[in-house]
């Protein structure tokens, strides 16, 4: 119990005395007031509480709480000085509010206990058997008389299909017809004749909640049948309260078996009632231990426990409390809070920093999806290149995953424990890019940070720097970058001192650098510096066999981001995606799937063709019919993988013939590396005769 000292026995002190006397957890050690006629002193004496005009002896008893009601600031200050470090000194007004709230809380809890006890008594004191099933035909409620007449204990049947417990039941028919059936004769088991009333339970919105069955021996007649139907209102009210909550709620019985969940729970976890009701309490947990089971074991509530739930591993905070009626454990109630909605600040931060990101590499080669020959070649090249210190040039169209490759190369290298920094060379002006890359000295320019600033090359020392869109650099920046690659040192803007740096450079471009060299917009010497280890990443249209695996991974990601539970694509939808030419590559595929899932009905689990955004699926066919001069191979009736290989082999052969078997020109025309061309020629057994 908490020891309390009241200083001041006027009206406020007396009012607090009245409240605290009724509280079982409070022990009032004394009431003190300088005025011997104070009303609170007389009342305290009536209750056998010590009274005094001096509080100092009692403060030495180290009370837990001292309530000051005199209004004298000097007394309050002296109390604060003399109190024990564990003693709390509260102004009387604050204490009055706090203890009033405590009293109100206790009153509400007592009312709730009395109501729950009353409902339980009503349900189990009736002479009629009562069974309630949910919309999945599983037993939710089973009273004492039902146990007696059916011959099975409640614990044996809760959560089981009604047909398994009572094979002759007609309750599932009520779920289909929603039509009540009154006073129906039925044989229960082998000999017991009963009269039963079956009722659909429907909420005010017209939604079917389940079915209630009330039955009795035929000798008892049906005088009390209508009274039992009042339980429908009780059940509907309790269900509606839970279902109206925006917080996810789950209820289990004393054995840890799921009894009830609401719509918010299903939306958050991605689990339906069928997957939870009647199942163990740890069914919904993907990471962590069941707090329901812990509460049932300890009979104590738990709060603020982090875990992951559902197939999408939603991160949540869980509060669980036991349901105890008259000392008997009935189950537990859990409230689940979603804490995963804070994620989209990264994009805003990137814009604020003008698309320059200084992040640790997030991806590995395991995150790169691809089983096509071209993708496997690119992956093998990247893994080999990661083990070398050479500068790597990633080439590929926008959206093919060049940044993903850069992350993976860094994580595979011996620099993985140091920084990985990404810079978009096209996002900044020349002056701003120079100061970001190389840093600047104090006073280098107007608005420069006092004391200067390190550049990204210095920040990435002993790590990796990813220069995206390197083909967009100006001639001046190209010259400065060349110096860094040659000399392995930088000079800050406004400075003269050379600062050595040890940085692995990974560059990327989606433009034709060779053409830029021919046009004089890209330095040849820089080209040879960055092109020591080129890797060509194929566009999506050249690896259509990867669309299914990519879609599975992207749908999983979007499920986590949007809180959905979509399982995948129908075959028609997959064929539609495979027929498209994907100018935006994997980025466009993610966009298409994301839009489809946003507008997908929350209860639907599969993306159909009709759900996909309208795009030019016939574009490839139209393009090829308008005089391209390409002779298509006969692929009618072939499987997709075989048709793609035939098409690819035919295209390579025709391109070789067009360029008189010059392998360099052929590779350039096809947009692949020489090594990749050799690989495919060997794979398809294409003739080498006449090649130069």
From Swiss-Prot:
Binding positions for ATP per the UniProt entry: 396-403, 460-469
Domain PAS, chain residue ranges per copy: 115-185, 234-305
Topological type in the membrane: Single-pass membrane protein
Gene Ontology BP term (one): positive regulation of DNA-templated transcription
PANTHER family in the record: SIGMA L-DEPENDENT TRANSCRIPTIONAL REGULATOR YQIR-RELATED (PTHR32071:SF121), TRANSCRIPTIONAL REGULATORY PROTEIN (PTHR32071)
Gene Ontology CC annotation, any one: plasma membrane
Record localization: Cell membrane
Main location per the UniProt record: membrane
CDD domains referenced in this protein's UniProt entry, alphabetically: AAA, PAS
SMART domains found in the cross-reference section: AAA, PAS
Key words, A-Z: ATP-binding, Cell membrane, DNA-binding, Membrane, Nucleotide-binding, Repeat, Transcription, Transcription regulation, Transmembrane, Transmembrane helix, Two-component regulatory system
DNA-binding annotation, residue ranges on this chain: 663-682
TM region(s), chain numbering: 13-33
GO molecular function per UniProt: ATP binding; ATP hydrolysis activity; cis-regulatory region sequence-specific DNA binding; DNA-binding transcription activator activity
ATP-binding in keyword set: yes
Listed name of the protein: Putative sigma L-dependent transcriptional regulator YqiR
InterPro entries associated with the record: AAA+_ATPase (IPR003593), Homeodomain-like_sf (IPR009057), HTH_Fis (IPR002197), NAD(P)-bd_dom_sf (IPR036291), P-loop_NTPase (IPR027417), PAS (IPR000014), PAS-like_dom_sf (IPR035965), PAS_fold (IPR013767)
Provenance organism: Bacillus subtilis (strain 168)
Domain Sigma-54 factor interaction: 368-598
Gene symbol of the encoding locus: yqiR
